[in-house]
Amino acid sequence: ILSDILGDPVDMIASGPACADVSTCEEAMQIVEKYQLSISSQARQLLKIETPKTVTNAENVVMGSVKELCRAAEIACRRRGYQVTFLTDRLNCEAKEAGTFLAAIAQSHQDSVKSLAFLAGGETVVHIRGNGKGGRNQELAL
């Protein structure tokens, strides 16, 4: 499995197709009631049938993830002579906040004569107001 989810929860990666369904019939019915959904009696009957909670014929192995990517980047940087500081593999905030944080780290080391690499992986978000242009990476860089 290649994970694009922080922390690699297998049931969340690609909506968890290789995992047992952890939701319950009761939860499904609560959603129907909460949103006052109109469903057929046949659908209502199907929602009363529990799904298997274990899968015995599958093994999930995360082969690639943000954590693995950060490790590989660290190895590559060290091979090239950089002094590496691993910050996080769970960056999870507004892109603007991440940019401010990373810029402060870079500025505090701008006079260093060493070759430095600061590594951070994760996922940033941008909340757009009005007509925005660009995306998370551009927002972080600006």
Please place each PLM-identified region on the residue numbering:
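Active-site histidine-anchored catalytic micro-motif
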Residues: 1-29, 33-39, 111-121, 126-142
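Accessory alpha-helical/coil subdomains and C-terminal extensions
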Residues: 14, 20-101, 108
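Short, hydrophobic/amphipathic alpha-helical packing segments
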Residues: 99-103, 141-142
